[in-house]
A protein has these predicted regions:
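Conserved C-terminal beta-signal and adjacent last beta-strands/turns
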Residues: 19-26, 35-40, 46, 169, ...
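Signature of Gram-negative outer-membrane beta-barrel scaffolds
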Residues: 20, 36, 40, 44-176, ...
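Repeated loop/turn-to-beta-strand initiation elements of outer-membrane beta-barrel proteins
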Residues: 44-47, 128-131, 178-181, 235-239, ...
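Single conserved hydrophobic/aromatic residue that forms the stacking wall/gate
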Residues: 2-8, 12-13, 401-412
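Membrane-embedded beta-barrel scaffold of Gram-negative outer-membrane proteins
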Residues: 181-182, 190, 216-268, 274
Length: 412
């Protein structure tokens, strides 16, 4: 507290956490290797065998600087003249001390190594039907090293090692030269990111919630089914309708909880969930060099939660999934000679209301409200080697609003 000489009933409260300065150092490297072989047995059919290797490593550490004002106790005659007490002279005299803090729990190291092999083939059993079959094997080794509260640097380690098979099937049936039907089925994986898996406390932006990763996270697996109708017109015009269904095994969700009286965001695997929806997409040439594109989708999601879990709402949609999504773009691309071209684009996006963080232990869900964004981009190609680009994002400049449901009372 700093007393005020003229108005003794008011106080300036020191909040070392809010005035703290935070610096993060991230060192990350990634190595990739690919090898593929292809055999053709006729003009339209082939077999492909491939191998992939990926090794990604991260080293992150944080340093905090705190202002220690314990020795500073001036009488302030002008609250608007902060230079009278927050100045270099008081720092030199030791009245204000800047403390540099590096703690083991503020650092982590993480890595992910993936060995994979795949086999795929394209062939035409009939003239109108294209079949694409694939099978991928992956051996992944993901790990994170960190320190618990009061522990030594990188003293704890969590491993997430998996061996998985990912089959895929894609069918395309050409009804006629302008109409086709596609069907696809696949199994895919959602791995926790390093920041989701590392039990490291951080903030995404000033004033936002504290976030801590969860070292107990497991992979999420997705079973995807899509059916799509496409119609192609002249000048690149296109219309498509897609229906899809996804079964989600152990999806990763962002949650919010109470720890030490403060709200803390983290991540957790739900039991399972599903998503089903329909999407409409079109591209249309309006006049020469002017095109309009748009797509809109509706999606229904549902999550099954553990019976004995601490989730506040037992029935809800999937975290992060918007039921309504829409995009539209208007592009103008005239050419001036062989190399010069102007590209102007106006891009609109609508993202419906969605759960930003799932509430547990009586805390309500945090919902992100519907968001509209409008971006503009311009580019001009002088020749094959030089381009000028301009990008202006968020022309509408609307607020991103999060609303938290009321906390439910708990009986103790």
């Amino acid at each position: 507290e700093i007393s005020l000489g003229l108005v003794g009933s008011e106080m300036c409260i020191r909040d070392s956490q809010e005035t703290m300065r935070y610096f993060g150092s991230l060192d990350e490297e990634e190595w990739n290797a690919n090898l593929a072989m292809r055999w053709k047995w006729n003009d339209t059919s082939h077999l492909k065998l491939g191998f992939n290797y990926k090794d990604k490593n991260r080293d992150y550490s944080a340093t905090r600087f705190y202002y220690n004002l314990n020795k500073l106790n001036p009488v302030i005659t002008d609250i608007y003249n902060t230079d009278g007490f927050l100045n270099q002279q008081n720092i030199a005299d030791g009245q204000i001390v800047v403390q540099r803090v590096m703690q083991p729990k503020d650092s982590y190291r993480a890595g992910n190594e993936i060995y994979s092999a795949y086999l795929l083939t394209d062939f035409y059993p009939t003239e109108a039907l294209l079949v694409n079959l694939g099978l991928r094997y992956e051996m992944s080794k993901q790990w994170v090293r960190y320190a618990s509260d009061g522990g030594d640097w990188y003293s704890r380690r969590r491993n997430l090692d998996k061996n998985d098979l990912f089959p895929a099937l894609n069918l395309k049936y050409a009804v006629n030269p302008t109409n086709s039907i596609r069907f696809s089925a696949s199994r895919t994986v959602t791995r926790p990111s390093f920041i989701e898996m590392a039990p490291f406390l951080y903030q995404e932006s000033y004033g936002s919630a504290q976030i801590r990763g969860n070292e107990e996270l497991q992979n999420g697996y997705n079973y995807n089914f899509d059916l799509r109708y496409e119609r192609f017109g002249k000048d690149g015009d296109m219309l498509s309708v897609t229906g899809y269904f996804k079964y989600l095994d152990s999806p990763i969700e962002r949650i919010q909880d109470l720890q030490g009286g403060a709200t803390l965001h983290s991540f957790k695997n739900a039991d399972n969930g599903m998503a089903a929806g329909v999407e409409l997409e079109m591209r249309k040439r309006l006049v020469k060099d002017l095109r309009l594109g748009a797509n809109i989708s509706y999606m229904y999601t549902n999550v099954k939660l553990p019976q004995s879990g601490a989730y506040t709402n037992k029935e809800r949609s999937l975290q992060g999934a918007s039921p309504i999504l829409a995009n539209a773009d208007l592009t103008y691309s005239p050419r001036f000679g062989e190399d010069r071209q102007l590209n102007l684009a106006l891009l609109y996006n609508l993202q419906g209301s969605r759960i930003h963080a799932v509430g547990v232990s009586g805390l309500g869900d945090v919902t992100q409200q519907t968001l509209h964004t409008l971006n503009f981009s311009a580019g001009y190609s002088l020749n094959k080697h030089f381009n000028l680009k301009l990008q202006v994002n968020d022309l509408l400049n609307l607020s991103l609003i999060h609303i938290s449901e009321p906390t439910r009372p708990r009986l103790i």
